[in-house]
């Protein structure tokens, strides 16, 4: 078959096009998935039109391989591209068709900045606040925004979004500012942004949700400071939805393009029961391909990063119906209305409406 030494090189080193053989089988994919670069990008930038896929391919392997609209596949391949993945899930689409799209809801997003703005979020950012006089350049922030307010996959497309760029790239070229713990600096940058949003709320800006899709507090040894500022923001009517708040009630789940079933990512397998006890949030659609204006990428192993903006978006939809709803009440309603433990946006909105109407009658 293949030279095992070449496999080892593939798993441990940088992936290059010449490492992709003319004949691709499942065994090769298993080794390729050991490569960090391949796990992140897969075939997203590959021309495979002259390659041949041979043998049987297990869905559990195929769904881990990322690809994009730039990928050129041969006619026969084990990947089933689904154009429905350019859209929100049917439950969210149903809410949008009923005219609930986040009008009047103010959301702040604190994340890695980006230079290129994909068409998915073009015109969707009301305010972009740069950090240290320039923009960061990373795919994370643009994908978070796409899930939140994107034209095709966004949960709450009409919300007013202010983006706070923490620009960690700046410190890569200024290592003297970092010290011994880069994560501590990262946490401090986020904390400073939360204080900034709090002060703006005191001045009447009325941000209702802050979306932070990356872990930070424990790594930066600022747990007490974050707990304090989050509580102060709550006093102004603003809820911070980060990995800590998200994981109290929710977890992330993938959708298999080949058969429409749900599955947990590899990193969740060690705590299967824990994740299945939470309300599951599907977040494995096509997302903007980093560096491209109009191309999209499929990723089969999702994370909290992508599910947090979906929950923030659904909470925003619920706030449009009942502006006094707390995040804790929203989470309880999400559990009560879930379908087979999977979050159901239309069910949430119906329940929020029902509860609001009943409270008015009392």
Language model region names:
Residues 99, 113-118, 122-125, 148-152, ...:
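Sec/Tat-exported extracytoplasmic proteins
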Residues 115-116, 154, 167-170, 216, ...:
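Active-site/binding-pocket entry motifs
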């Amino acid at each position: 078959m293949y030279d095992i030494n070449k496999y080892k090189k593939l798993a441990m080193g940088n992936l290059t096009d010449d490492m992709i053989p003319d004949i691709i089988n499942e065994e090769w994919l298993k080794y390729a998935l050991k490569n960090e670069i391949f796990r992140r990008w897969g075939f997203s930038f590959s021309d495979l039109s002259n390659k041949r896929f041979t043998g049987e391919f297990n869905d559990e392997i195929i769904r881990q391989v990322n690809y994009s609209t730039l990928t050129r596949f041969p006619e026969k391949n084990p990947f089933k591209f689904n154009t429905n993945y350019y859209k929100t899930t049917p439950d969210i689409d149903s809410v949008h068709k009923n005219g609930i799209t986040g009008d009047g809801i103010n959301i702040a997003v604190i994340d890695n900045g980006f230079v290129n703005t994909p068409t998915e979020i073009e015109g969707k950012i009301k305010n972009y606040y740069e950090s240290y006089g320039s923009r960061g350049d990373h795919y994370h922030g643009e994908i978070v925004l796409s899930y939140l307010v994107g034209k095709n996959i966004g949960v709450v497309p009409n919300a007013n979004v202010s983006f706070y760029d923490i620009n960690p790239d700046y410190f890569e070229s200024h290592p003297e500012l970092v010290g011994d713990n880069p994560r501590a600096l990262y946490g401090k940058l986020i904390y400073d942004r939360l204080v900034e949003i709090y002060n703006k709320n005191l001045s009447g800006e009325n941000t209702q949700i802050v979306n932070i899709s990356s872990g930070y507090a424990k790594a930066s040894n600022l747990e007490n400071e974050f707990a304090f500022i989050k509580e102060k923001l709550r006093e102004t009517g603003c809820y911070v939805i980060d990995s800590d708040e998200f994981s109290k009630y929710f977890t992330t789940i993938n959708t298999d393009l080949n058969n429409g079933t749900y599955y947990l990512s590899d990193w969740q397998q060690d705590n299967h029961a824990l994740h299945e006890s939470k309300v599951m949030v599907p977040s494995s659609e096509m997302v903007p391909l980093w560096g491209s204006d109009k191309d999209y990428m499929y990723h089969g192993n999702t994370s909290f990063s992508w599910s947090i903006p979906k929950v923030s978006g659904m909470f925003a939809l619920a706030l449009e119906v009942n502006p006094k709803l707390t995040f804790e009440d929203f989470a309880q309603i999400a559990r009560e209305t879930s379908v087979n433990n999977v979050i159901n946006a239309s069910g949430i909105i119906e329940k929020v409406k029902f509860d609001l109407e009943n409270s008015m009658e009392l």
